[in-house]
Amino acid sequence: MENLRRLNITKEGIQFPSIVVVGDQSSGKSSVLESLAGISLPRGQGICTRVPLVMRLQNHPLPTPELVLEFNGKTISTDEANVSQAINAATEELAGHGKGISNNPLTLLVKKNGVPDLSMVDLPGITRVPVHGQPENIYDQIKDMIMEYIKPKESIILNVLSASVDFTTCESIRMSQSVDKAGLRTLAVVTKADKSPEGLLEKVNADEVNIGLGYVCVRNRIGDESYEDARVKEQRLFEFHPLLSKIDKSIVGVPVLA
């Protein structure tokens, strides 16, 4: 797929399936993307993703990972230690210093050993109530942006849901169902499984929401844990936890998602 991209065949009108990541604010979207890419992304309270972040992961046996940001016709090289700051700086250039959003995309190319060959678009988390510094119509702005990306039939919708919420009332589920009623191109990633293990088995086995591509339950990386430590703890969690160990092993863990 990446070879075709390089040939610019997309200009001929061939559509590539892209994975569009959607979720309510604080659902754990950034954590899922971090786990797949093995790099730290901007995190924090409130809205972190303020522009469409196109992440292109390429598995390369490089001694040192190569990270490049592309936006506004610029190309900026960065590294794992500084990528989060570089994304924040680029976001401010694209969307301003406040808390507003912009439809101008920011591309992050990651060439790294062991990452899956994937292209994903991370979109702002859905928020219903504008906080200080956000435009009054922030919900409509975010919804319009999400709909633009998930409408194409080629888009695979990766819906990030916190284990603590009722899936049937999730705004991101409502949006994806409005364009993919049968759920044939919708995959759900359930985050924070360790925080809300009660009833999770029943939720992912229920037929209340059409998730055609199924569920994957994950444990989010906590604080300064290394990615290796986080994966080991995740594996143990789903193996030995009295409730979570009952969930089918084919739908648990970040490696399954990759």
Explain the meaning of each model-derived region.
Residues 1-10:
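N-terminal pre-Walker A segment at the start of P-loop NTPase domains
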Residues 9-258:
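Globular "head" domains of long coiled-coil molecular machines
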